[in-house]
Regions:
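Acidic, glycine-enriched catalytic cores built around paired aspartates
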Residues: 1-286
Length: 286
């Protein structure tokens, strides 16, 4: 997760609609009367200030896909990513959804169903089917992760897991259906994105290794040497230098751990990245 998933959209995609709109959609989906649209006061934690009513379109900053009164905001774009891919994907999915809705509505009308009745029936069916994606709570909470799993929502925790779905047949069908991207174009983009990820992680690994070997380890060894001399001097002057020796041993264990970690990192960054682009990216991730 970027920034630990606590300062960025969570990996589980959900849609925030707000209490008022969610109540209306649930009423349509399940044939119930919608609750009133009165807003609750904001909980600002200051008793001397008057109650401030919450705007019905008050934003949920933890939602990756939020309705903010007159528009939806898609917030799951990576900081280094171009917005084009997200826009292409969203528009392709929207085109397919509208095409499906139009086909279902035309089929109902062809059977003689009145327009308003067909629309109401279709809306109720679609809203009920897609209610699992609607969530107005805290998208960062562990409770939401458990609830999302119950709802059957995917939780793609890393880049490689997400890019692996580029080649899914149903995903490629969405882009191919309206001539946006062919399967071959989808696979080529998947290959490029996986290679970019692998190279980025490899560069980061080699950089960390160089910093550890040339900047951190020499300082740690110099400090260890100073402690060794101090402990040796203390032992020569007094009978009880156990504390100095114990501290030296603690630092030495940390330095040994650093050296071992650097050796492990070196073996990893110089290891075999062979195989498919997906396998190489998975190796880099792991």
């Amino acid at each position: 997760h970027r920034l630990g998933a606590n300062e960025a959209p969570p990996a589980v995609l959900s849609v925030y609609l707000g209490d008022s709109l969610s109540a209306i959609i649930r009423a349509i989906a399940y044939g119930k009367e919608a609750a009133g649209g009165c807003s609750e006061p904001l909980q600002i934690g200051v008793s001397v200030l008057p109650n401030i009513p919450r705007d019905l379109s008050d934003r949920n900053r933890t939602s990756p896909f939020a309705f903010t009164g007159n528009k939806f905001e898609f917030r799951a774009l990576g900081s280094s990513q171009n917005i084009a891919t997200a826009n292409i994907s969203l528009n392709a999915a929207m085109a397919c959804a509208l095409d499906d809705i139009a086909s279902m509505l035309e089929a109902e009308l062809a059977q003689g169903t009145p327009l308003n009745a067909a629309i109401q029936s279709l809306l109720a069916k679609l809203f009920a089917e897609h209610m699992p994606i609607v969530f107005d709570g805290n998208g960062y909470s562990d409770e939401w992760l458990a609830e999302a799993e119950k709802r059957g929502l995917p939780n793609l925790k890393d880049t490689v897991a997400a890019l692996a779905h580029y080649s899914d047949k149903d995903v490629m069908a969405v882009f191919e259906r309206h001539g946006v991207l062919s399967p071959r174009e989808m696979l080529s983009r998947q290959e490029i994105l996986l290679e970019n990820y692998t190279h980025s992680v490899s560069i980061e690994g080699h950089t960390a290794l160089k910093l550890g070997r040339t900047r951190i380890l020499p300082v740690a060894l110099a400090y260890q040497t100073r402690l060794a001399k101090a402990a040796s001097s203390a032992a020569a002057l007094v009978d009880d230098a156990a504390e100095e020796k114990a501290y030296f041993v603690r630092v030495r264990e940390q330095v040994r751990g650093l050296m071992s970690a650097l050796d492990t990192l070196e073996a990893a960054v110089n290891g075999d990245f062979g195989g498919t682009a997906l396998a190489r990216a998975a190796y880099a991730r792991d």
